[in-house]
A protein has these predicted regions:
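Arg/Lys-rich, intrinsically disordered low-complexity tails that mediate electrostatic binding
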Residues: 1-20
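Glycine-rich beta-alpha loop segments
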Residues: 20, 24-117
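Solvent-exposed alpha-helices and their adjacent loops that cap or buttress functional pockets
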Residues: 51-54, 83, 108, 125-129, ...
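Glycine/threonine-rich flexible loop motifs
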Residues: 70-73, 165-169
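Acidic/glycine-enriched connector segments
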Residues: 75, 98-159, 163-164
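Short, solvent-exposed amphipathic alpha-helical segments in soluble enzyme
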Residues: 77-78, 108, 171-175, 202-205
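Short, acidic/small-residue loops that bind anionic groups at enzyme active sites
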Residues: 113-121, 158, 165, 172-200, ...
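C-terminal functional extensions of proteins
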Residues: 196-239
Length: 239
């Protein structure tokens, strides 16, 4: 009997498909598999739904954890949060020290609800400043998602470092890409003769826009303010 010749194409049909096994980067997921990490993220979102489900949207304040009372950034933040609280909006903040604590104090002084969205870090778990509710997160992403969701009236950025910059740029990009509702993104300059954010705006205008990677009309919702009165005016104009 003649053996039937099988073409390479035909023989490929009879081969068992091999499933590739992908190893998750356990180091980046704290030793968890991809499925375990996904479930952990989902649990944090469910916790937010249970804890803050009936809490109205408000104004999110962000800034450095490294400032202390007596620092003009800290002191002006208290005044700003108080003024915003008097408008009747809940204040959402990170629950940590520094600018986050100042936001909580201002919220309490203005009689508004203070909601702490805390991140578990190596240091002792502690909520800084007065607060009515607190939610603890194990990961950055669900915390940022919650700030984005509940800070839908406006988001105020006081001076901060890499974390604050990440939150600010992430929010701006989400709004630009229509992944989040438009709201004012406000950068607050607490000290008139020592600008903190102006350099960022100069870079966007004189470098990024000049080479065509951004247009002014892409970010009409981004503001820079230099006083509490200006901050209140921007928020009132949008609501």
């Amino acid at each position: 009997n003649k053996k039937k010749k099988v073409s390479k194409m035909d023989s490929g049909k009879h081969k068992r498909s091999r499933k590739r096994k992908f190893k998750s980067n356990s180091a980046s997921n704290n030793g968890l598999s991809s499925n375990q990490f996904g479930r952990r993220i989902a649990r944090q979102h469910k916790l937010v739904a249970r804890t803050l489900g009936r809490t109205p949207p408000g104004i999110a304040f962000m800034g450095s954890a490294r400032t202390r009372p007596g620092n003009p950034y800290y002191d002006v933040n208290i005044e700003a949060a108080k003024a915003v609280a008097l408008l009747g909006f809940p204040i959402y903040h990170g629950g940590g020290p520094g600018q986050m604590e100042a936001s909580a104090i201002g919220a309490a002084q203005g009689g508004a609800k203070s909601v702490a969205l805390c991140l578990r870090l190596a240091r002792k778990e502690e909520v800084f400043g007065p607060h009515d509710q607190a939610v603890w997160f194990d990961d950055f992403s669900p915390r940022v998602d919650t700030l984005r969701r509940f800070g839908s009236i406006a988001m105020v950025f006081f001076p901060g470092g890499i974390g604050t910059m990440h939150e600010a740029m992430s929010m701006i990009d989400n709004i630009m890409q229509k992944k989040a509702p438009v709201r004012p993104i406000i950068f607050f300059e607490p000290v008139a003769d020592k600008p903190y954010w102006q350099g960022l705006f100069d870079w966007l205008k004189n470098v990024v826009m000049v080479v065509g990677l951004l247009k002014a009309e892409d970010i009409p919702f981004v503001h820079i303010v230099r006083s509490v009165d200006e901050l209140v005016a921007v928020i009132k104009a949008q609501n």
